[in-house]
């Protein structure tokens, strides 16, 4: 097994001795402006406070630096990004398959599943499959899709409704209505 040097990932902000400017625009711990000071003076102030000097805006003239606890800053940043990820809802397309001869009991079970999908904010794809001689009775399939559409009109809006059969199936896509 080979040993190797562990490559340190580059930090997004330069801190303490990594800052290269001679003068910096300094911001205090509480966000108050301390004016333009020399880098040495800024580093002395951070030593006194026992925290880090972090370069916030390296492209400014002079660069903007802030006195802060860098570890705490990174923790807060990662915590807020995790919160934002939690709030994002990924919309999925859930599929339910019907047949032209789907009985009433099965229809109700599938309808309940569709209602659950739409209430959770997901799109629903209703696939109606035809087998054998069922192809001759496409109007029965259209009746099933129209019934589903009518039963879910309070919860969903139709995104796509089949005008003709594609292969051996008809596909209808429903999207949840926006909540007011």
Swiss-Prot record:
Subcellular location: Cytoplasm
Entry GO terms, CC: cytosol; membrane
UniProt-listed SUPFAM superfamilies: Translation initiation factor IF3, C-terminal domain, Translation initiation factor IF3, N-terminal domain
UniProt entry keywords in alphabetical sequence: Cytoplasm, Initiation factor, Protein biosynthesis
Molecular function GO terms recorded: ribosome binding; translation initiation factor activity
Primary localization: cytoplasm
Gene Ontology process terms (BP): ribosome disassembly
Coiled-coil portions: none
Domain of life assignment: Bacteria
Summary of subunit composition and partner proteins: Monomer.
Entry similarity comment: Belongs to the IF-3 family.
Purpose of the protein: IF-3 binds to the 30S ribosomal subunit and shifts the equilibrium between 70S ribosomes and their 50S and 30S subunits in favor of the free subunits, thus enhancing the availability of 30S subunits on which protein synthesis initiation begins.
Protein name stated in the entry: Translation initiation factor IF-3
Species for this entry: Salmonella paratyphi A (strain ATCC 9150 / SARB42)
């Amino acid at each position: 097994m080979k040993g190797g040097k562990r490559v340190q990932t580059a930090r997004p902000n330069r801190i303490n001795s990594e800052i290269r400017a001679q003068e910096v625009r300094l911001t205090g711990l509480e966000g108050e402006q301390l004016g333009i000071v020399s880098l040495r003076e800024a580093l002395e102030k951070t030593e006194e406070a026992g925290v880090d000097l972090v370069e916030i805006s390296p492209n400014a003239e002079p660069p903007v630096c802030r006195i802060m606890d860098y570890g705490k800053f990174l923790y807060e940043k990662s915590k807020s990004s995790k919160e934002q990820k939690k709030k994002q809802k990924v919309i999925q397309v859930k599929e339910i398959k019907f047949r032209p001869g789907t009985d009433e009991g099965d229809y109700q079970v599938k309808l309940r599943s569709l209602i659950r999908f739409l209430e959770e904010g997901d799109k629903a794809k209703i696939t109606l499959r035809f087998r054998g001689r069922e192809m001759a009775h496409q109007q029965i399939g259209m009746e099933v899709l129209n019934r589903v559409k009518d039963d879910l009109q309070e919860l969903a809006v139709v995104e796509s409704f089949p005008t003709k059969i594609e292969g051996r199936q008809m596909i209808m896509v429903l999207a949840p209505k926006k909540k007011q």
